């Protein structure tokens, strides 16, 4: 069963900044980056407990190909995943 994913304003800004950075390096690279982010989030939504808790209730998911981590919190009671940060490692 899938969950709802909600982006924090910080995560949305970080994602936009990273997309712009990659897209400015090479046309289409930003789109490729977003596709890998989407695949990672889809995995999280389908398997919210698929990554270990790292700090308290927060979990970290590595993005394939790109050196990024997605930090999220899973609230089981309302089946919601809060994406808190998307950052370069």
Name the predicted role of every residue range:
Residues 59-63:
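Short acidic-hydrophobic surface loop/beta-edge motif
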Residues 1-58, 76-78:
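Basic, Lys/Arg-enriched alpha-helical interface segments
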């Amino acid at each position: 069963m899938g969950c709802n994913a909600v982006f924090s304003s910080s995560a949305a800004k970080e994602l936009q900044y990273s997309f712009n950075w990659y897209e400015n390096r090479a046309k289409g690279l930003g789109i490729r980056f977003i596709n890998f982010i989407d695949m990672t989030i889809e995995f999280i939504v389908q398997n919210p407990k698929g990554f270990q808790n790292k700090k308290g209730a927060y979990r970290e998911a590595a993005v394939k190909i790109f050196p990024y981590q997605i930090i999220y919190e899973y609230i089981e009671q309302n089946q919601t995943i809060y994406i808190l940060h998307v950052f370069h490692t």
